[in-house]
Every structure is written in structure tokens, then in C-alpha cells.
A protein has these predicted regions:
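Acidic (Asp/Glu)-rich catalytic clusters
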Residues: 19-24, 38-59, 82-93
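Short, Lys/Arg-rich amphipathic segments at extreme N-termini
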Residues: 3-18
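Hydrophobic faces of well-ordered beta-strands that scaffold small-molecule active sites
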Residues: 2-7, 30-32, 55-60, 96-98
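Short, mixed-charge, low-aromatic patches
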Residues: 1-4, 34-41, 80-81
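Short, histidine-centered active-site or binding-site loop motifs used for metal coordination
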Residues: 26, 61-62, 100-102
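A short, Lys/Arg-enriched amphipathic alpha-helix followed by its capping loop at the start of a domain
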Residues: 1-3, 21-28
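Acidic-and-aromatic substrate-binding clefts and catalytic sites of carbohydrate-active enzymes
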Residues: 10-14, 31-43, 65-68, 104-108
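Active-site acidic/histidine proton-transfer and metal-coordination neighborhood
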Residues: 71-111
Length: 111
């Protein structure tokens, strides 16, 4: 079994140091923040090559939700998710985690 981790607040901020830290803790992969990946793609590629630690998936890193009732926000989220998936493909990642919308639908749903 292989075990990966998401980014955590106590991890180093430098991308290379982050990868080295995760590898030193014994993890087999890294579930990266989508925005971090897209905005630092070349640096992430270099860290993967240097450490051998793969980016397996991405979680978060987009501003809209795919189920948002406001069309503009939904489309914005989809565009950002598309960029994240393209970047993931470049580093060999397998997919993106799209968690629940933290109550965004509660104003539309009955109690």
C-alpha cells in the first residue's frame, strides 16, 4: 500500500523543501494544492525529479464550485479545474479531489 499526504500548514513553504520534507516523513506521494501546482509548475517538476516523490492528485486550488448556482462562479471553477488537470497530466498525476462545498447549498435546500 502506498500513502500520500495533502499539504499541511506546518510543512515548509519552499516547494523543494516541502517535497524533501514529505519524502523524509516516509510518504509515497503528495496531494498538492491545485493553485500551488498551476502557479509553480516548473518548480514542482524540478522537485519531483530531485526527490522522486510523485504528485498523485490535487485538492482545492480553485475559486468556484462545479455545482454553484451562480453560473459565473461555476464556470470560473470549471476553468480553474481544467488548468489544474492539465498541470497534473504534465507531472503524471491521476486526478483531482473536489470536496463538498462547505455548506454553500444550504441557503437553497430545505432544513
Amino acid at each position: 500500500m502506498k500513502i500520500a499526504t495533502q499539504n499541511q500548514a506546518f510543512f515548509p513553504t519552499s516547494i523543494m523543501e516541502k517535497f524533501e520534507y514529505i519524502k523524509a516523513m516516509g510518504f509515497d506521494g503528495y496531494e498538492i494544492d491545485g493553485r500551488l501546482l498551476v502557479e509553480n509548475l516548473d518548480e514542482v517538476k524540478a522537485a519531483i525529479k530531485a526527490t522522486g516523490l510523485p504528485v498523485t492528485t490535487a485538492c482545492g486550488g480553485y475559486d468556484g464550485w462545479i455545482g454553484d448556482f451562480i453560473e459565473e462562479r461555476r464556470l470560473n471553477g470549471l476553468q480553474q479545474i481544467e488548468r489544474i488537470l492539465e498541470a497534473l497530466a504534465e507531472v503524471g498525476g491521476k486526478g483531482i479531489i473536489v470536496p463538498a462545498a462547505w455548506g454553500m447549498f444550504t441557503f437553497r435546500l430545505p432544513p
